[in-house]
Structures are given as structure tokens and as C-alpha cells.
């Protein structure tokens, strides 16, 4: 072991240098770091000899390309996935037909360019060209003193095209007038306004409304709505059976169709006990053409449609087997019965309800089963310029006690309700106008102010509350069918648009399984002209129909129990027993119940006889 210079030389010779190796060009003036930086700058230049020829090319300068070899694969010489235009058109038509069916659910999609199938309408190219024409050639440069062309470019080449376009515009205009007639109650089974009395829509500036009529349109309410929609897999759109078109939220339907087409939308026609069965069945047939529709009477002790709705939710939970649970959100106008439906499904009061709008402030989760959760949402009121204050008030959007001058809305009530219904409800006759009617009602009830003057404001609020809470019978009739149009869908010929019952085996195969219920059953029903409404103490048509068919009110055999499948509640047998104890009434629209199952359930429910004692023989 040497020291000093000899030892350093030996370590370098054996390659045991601990520090950085010496870089070429490193000296006292240039460190290794500086030399590396200079080499980076020199790297982009080629090295040439004294004759100027490139001896060593710079980085990425060489033009010598290595020989490329194609992978020997047979797929290079086969045809690609091609499809003809005729096949694509037929496939597009088949997909469009299935999309229109509200009872079809897409379970799995193939690896196809769906943009080629779900393209825009046929006139999408014309609309795009018209948009580009307007942007490139504005109106001021085409018409007027600054016009730069003699003849404007029109989208119609012939008079026939112009006539066809005019007819389509006229049909759209007539459809809008028909919708106005339906909303005003001037169409349907007789009565109402004539065609000449329906005024056309004017585009004048709307006057200022009271602040109370902006309820349900705040940013907080819409945030709650979008939170419920984003958190839900199935959306239950609750609609009032007395005014289905007025309480139908088109904004939610359009939002789900464009932004969330994977979510399922279901219409729930609530409060069907306040309308005739014929009218409820007609509205269900109309609404089920767009989305699946269920009829519901939200009552804890005596519900109607509860079993069918639970069965439908179970079907959606089966469709989404990959998820641990599904969430069902209830949306709709205020005071249509969203929280009441949750209580009816659970069989006990779990959500706060009240006969006034705006009781639900924020969204809340409620457990229905182990795999199904319910989400309650505050009521929303989509802004619409055509909605007048009286329309919003009669839909139950605002609270009557907060409205100024309530007597000004009584004429709208008298227009919607037939005179004999008002006479039968309040036992009054012979009023001249709405003020005279309120004075007569106030004097009859003893509601007088100082000096013997009738309390018109108080009586008007009472009448409005009776109108919204169902004490005054009224309903909007369904639109009449056109000639040659059928209101029943294929495979759903039941009374309320449900599927046909299981036909008996002893019937002939050639005989039809069911017949449309609109001809036979509707003839026995009460005429809507003579409809007098239902009191809280009297039985409704739903209960009377159940009694005619021999079904008991207090039995739960025709109800679908919550613990019938693996979807049990989290609380186990305790909550299941509570729901079963509260189940009363009958469900007429439950499908698939056979006579054998009913006989077996009756045999199980009947107590077993005591065993007979055997006598022993004495020997």
C-alpha cells in the first residue's frame, strides 16, 4: 500500500475511482460540467474532413433509412367491415322503431359507429345550409335599400314545396291551439269553449307578476332537482290525474332525453281517486305512448297501484344487476303527492306531508328495500311565458293564504268546474257572477264582517283550498281520438293499458286472449257528465270495482310483499312485518296472479284442523 501519487495511480488503474471520471477536454479552465454543455451544442453539427465531406452525420441528419418489413398477416389482404347504404337504412329504421317503444330497454350495445345510425332528421342539411346563408348573407344585404342582389335565394324551388311547407306550419299551429284548449279545459267529452272562443296566442309583453308566483323557480330548487336526477337511476315523474298536461314537466323530459338517455323515466298518475275511472284509463293510454305509466292512489292504509309500482321497480333492479342498489327519484310540480307516494310505498309515514305546496324543502333518502332507495325532491315549477297567475294558482303551486285579492281567481274556478258540481258541493243555486256566488256562500256560512258585510276574501280562499284539495269535483278530459286511431298499444289491451291477463288453458288457441276494455267495461262506468266526485268517507270507484270482483279490502294476497324476493329491507323482519300489517285494500292492476296461487295462499292462511285422537283397543 503506497501513499500519495502512487496510491492514486493504482486506484485509477484498477477502476476504483470513487469520483466522476475525467471528461475529455477537462482542464484547469473548463470543468467537466462546462465541457458537457459545450458537447450538447456541438451535437447538432456534422463532422467533416478537410475536403468538406461529412464523416459523421449529426443527430437526426442521416438519410439512410433502414429496410422496413411488413408483418406477414393475412388480415392485410382481407376485406374490412363494410356495410351498404340499404342495410344501414333498414338498421337505422329498426333502431328508431325500438327507440320509440317506451317499454323497450337497451341492455347491451354493439361496437358500431352509432353516430351513423342516430343522425339528425332528414332536413338537417337544409337547416345547416339556411343557417350558413343567414350568417353569410344577412337580411340587410338581401332586402332593403342596401340590397346587393336582385332576387333572394329561396329554399323552395317549386310551388308544391312551398305548399307542403305551409301545410306543415298550419298543422303545427293547429296542434298548439289544441294544446291550449286542453290546458283550458275546453276539449274532451262535451262542454267548454267553442273553437271560435279560443283566442290565439299573443306575443305581447307580459305584465309584472306577484312575487308569490315565482315560487319553485329559485336556483336552490333547481340545484336540488339536478342533484336528484344525477343521483337517480330511475325517475318517477309524478303527475296530477286531474290536470296531467298542466302538471307535466317537459323540461325534465327534454333534459333526460338529451343529457341522460341512460336513465329510465316513468309517469306516475297520482290522485286517480279524484277522477272517473274512464278518464283515468284514457289518460294512461295517452301518456304510455311516450313513457311507461302507472296509476297510483297514495294512501298508507288503502293504496291503489302500490304493488304494480313496486314490481316495476324490482324489474329495474334486476336489469341493473351489476349495481349494489338503484336509486329512484321522484320529481314533479309542488303538491302533486311525491312524499305521499313514498309513504304509501313504505306503508308508514317516513316523509313529511301536508296539503299545502312547498312542504319538502331539501332532498332526502328513504330506504324502500335493500337494493332500492327512494329520493324525495322539492316541487319545481318550470318557467313558462304562457302560464298565467291563475293557472299557477289552480295547479297548487302557491299557497292560497299568501295571495292578494283571491276573489279575482274565482272566475277561473267556475270555468273549470261544471255548475251542477258547484251546486251539489255548496248547495247553492242562482248566482249571477263570482262576487254574487261568494256573497251567497259567505252569508250561508255566517262569515260576515262588521256591518254585516260578507267576508269575500276569506270565502274565496276557502273555495280555492277546496278546489285544490279535491273537495270540488273537477278534471281535465282526455283528448278525443281521431278517426282510425287506436289508443291501445300492441300487447297492452288492459283497462289501464296493462298487459293482458294469463289466458286459461281450456280456451281455444284461435280465440283472442283478451278484448279491449274500452268497449265493455267503460260502458258500465259512470258518465263523466254525471260525475259528482268522491268524499273522504265514501268509497271511490277503485274500491267499488274491487268489491264487484269479489276482492276483499283488508287482504294482502294481491299485493306484492316487500320480502317476497331477495330484496329484503335493511332492518330485517321488523320493518317487513310493519309493512305487511299496514297493507290494506286491493290492487286491480297486478298482473300474473293465477287462481292456483290464490288457492294455495288461502290454504296456507287457513288454520290447520286439530289432529284426531286415536283410540287404543283394549285387549
Swiss-Prot record:
Family as reported in the entry's similarity comment: Belongs to the TRAFAC class YlqF/YawG GTPase family. NOG2 subfamily.
InterPro entries: G_CP_dom, GNL2_CP_dom, GTP-bd, GTP-bd_ortho_bundle_sf, NOG2_N_dom, P-loop_NTPase, TRAFAC_YlqF/YawG_RiboMat
Entry's localization field: Nucleus, Nucleolus
Domain CP-type G: 222-383
Protein name: Nucleolar GTP-binding protein 2
Comp. bias regions, Acidic residues: 536-546, 565-603
Keyword entries, A-Z: GTP-binding, Nucleotide-binding, Nucleus, Ribosome biogenesis
Protein residues bound to GTP: 332-339, 376-380
One GO term of the biological process aspect: ribosome biogenesis
Keyword flag Nucleotide-binding: yes
Any GO molecular function: GTP binding
Species assigned in the record: Neurospora crassa (strain ATCC 24698 / 74-OR23-1A / CBS 708.71 / DSM 1257 / FGSC 987)
Taxonomic placement: Eukaryota, Fungi, Dikarya, Ascomycota, Pezizomycotina
Stated role: GTPase that associates with pre-60S ribosomal subunits in the nucleolus and is required for their nuclear export and maturation.
